[in-house]
């Protein structure tokens, strides 16, 4: 019964992710049994129609080893029930897979992107590198000047090769499948509220297969602890501290950047 209820609540989750959720709730259930019931009750996720993707050799960047080493940005488009279209700026930490921001508005310029990044940085600290496509917002004078003044490296993927920004491609697919295709947005404030709730759920509750089924938040906390222990061991052998303990980059609070 709980499996069916959870599958109804998480309609786009497969049996593996549902099994993780059940175990987290304290249900001692075998994964094969979950799979069998999942099939018998016809809870299987229905495949959506595919879309054309740019062809070409995948050239993924090296996997970052710490939070804030690399963020990636992208846009997703949707529309409200009255037909008005809006865009969503997605900001992802490529190491922890945390969604740092979902910014929804009818217009998102390069200057607006810069303001939203500044707001995230105030909460989380500055990234070493940001990855994006070559959209006009990301190649605007506002973004170029910001990257130069902050010292953040900005890496542009090859034109027509969205797969080179694989972290955002994967995240945007989950966002589309689990939320946007399932929700009717009545207004922009409604869309922002729903996106915020989903972002928090994604970071704090949703198990991630690439993180050993940990949530992005739990993985970030575990990784931060490992980095802290390593730094303590190094610091014990050093003449002086190697890093400022008040460095704001150690703050891993998540933030949703919203339009006022």
Language model features with spans:
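Basic, flexible linker segments flanking DNA-binding modules
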Residues: 1-70, 136, 159-162, 215-225
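Mobile genetic element proteins and their domesticated derivatives, centered on retroelements
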Residues: 3, 18, 34, 38, ...
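Acidic/histidine-rich, metal-coordinating catalytic segments
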Residues: 117, 124-140, 159-162, 214-217
